[in-house]
């Protein structure tokens, strides 16, 4: 069924395929255009550099008049990210406008890596370390970057394991 939200999401997907902003990628699930997987690569010259951070975007039929629900699936240590992965970002709440699309949502989240807002913390510990103990903050962030790589390797191992299982079945 084609609805305004679904048509808009297909346009957003086309834009992401043809002209994705640097360091971000996203696509809908194969069987549900209303749910997207996304990834943000940590920007250069930040403690998040080269991290691979996975996100989930869930849209409803009111999109683009209402923002999607967005959360990190990857572990994240950031002043504006709650422990459950939800993001404290004004455009995902009271400053949302229908002109935002998937690309602009992801680039706005990516900009938080460059410019955290410790004045409006979702993670008080991260905000305090960011303001008062920058070296400890950077150390914690780098640990999450390394964890993001391990998670990616685990995902690849899981894929390999699936292939191995198929080979085992054929050998029997």
From Swiss-Prot:
Residues 151-172 have a biased composition (Acidic residues). GO terms for biological process: cellular response to unfolded protein; cytoplasm protein quality control by the ubiquitin-proteasome system; DNA repair; DNA-templated transcription termination; double-strand break repair via homologous recombination; ERAD pathway; error-free postreplication DNA repair; error-free translesion synthesis. It catalyses: S-ubiquitinyl-[E1 ubiquitin-activating enzyme]-L-cysteine + [E2 ubiquitin-conjugating enzyme]-L-cysteine = [E1 ubiquitin-activating enzyme]-L-cysteine + S-ubiquitinyl-[E2 ubiquitin-conjugating enzyme]-L-cysteine. CDD domains: UBCc_UBE2A_2B (cd23790). Residues 4-150 form the UBC core domain. The N-terminus is blocked. It is found in: Cytoplasm; Nucleus. Keywords: ATP-binding, Chromatin regulator, Cytoplasm, DNA damage, DNA repair, Nucleotide-binding, Nucleus, Phosphoprotein, Sporulation, Transcription, Transcription regulation, Transferase, Ubl conjugation pathway. One of its GO terms (molecular function) is ATP binding. The modification Phosphoserine is found at residue 120. The active site is at residue 88. PANTHER family: UBIQUITIN-CONJUGATING ENZYME E2 (PTHR24067). Present with 2770 molecules/cell in log phase SD medium. E2 ubiquitin-conjugating enzyme that accepts ubiquitin from the ubiquitin-activating enzyme E1 and transfers it to a E3 ubiquitin-protein ligase. In association with the E3 enzyme BRE1 and LGE1, it plays a role in transcription regulation by catalyzing the monoubiquitination of histone H2B to form H2BK123ub1. H2BK123ub1 gives a specific tag for epigenetic transcriptional activation, elongation by RNA polymerase II, telomeric silencing, and is also a prerequisite for H3K4me and H3K79me formation. Forms a heterodimer complexes with the E3 enzymes BRE1, RAD18 and UBR1. Also interacts with UBR2, RTF1, PAF1 and the RNA polymerase II hyperphosphorylated form. The interaction with RNA polymerase II is BRE1- and PAF1-dependent. This is Ubiquitin-conjugating enzyme E2 2. The gene is RAD6.
């Amino acid at each position: 069924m084609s609805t305004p939200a679904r048509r808009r999401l297909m346009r957003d997907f086309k834009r992401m395929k043809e002209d994705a902003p640097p360091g971000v990628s996203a696509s809908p699930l194969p069987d549900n255009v209303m749910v997207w997987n996304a990834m943000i690569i940590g920007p250069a010259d930040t403690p998040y550099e080269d991290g691979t951070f996975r996100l989930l975007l869930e849209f409803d039929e009111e999109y683009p008049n209402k923002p999607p629900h967005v959360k990190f699936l990857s572990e994240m240590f950031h002043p504006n990210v709650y422990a459950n992965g939800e993001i404290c970002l004004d455009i995902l709440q009271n400053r949302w406008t229908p002109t935002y699309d998937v690309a602009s949502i992801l680039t706005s989240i990516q900009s938080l890596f460059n410019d955290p807002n410790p004045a409006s913390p979702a993670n008080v510990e991260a905000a305090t370390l960011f303001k008062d103990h920058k070296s400890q903050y950077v150390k914690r962030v780098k640990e999450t970057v390394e964890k993001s790589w391990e998670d990616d390797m685990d995902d690849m191992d899981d894929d390999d394991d699936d292939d191995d299982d198929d080979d085992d079945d054929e050998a029997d």
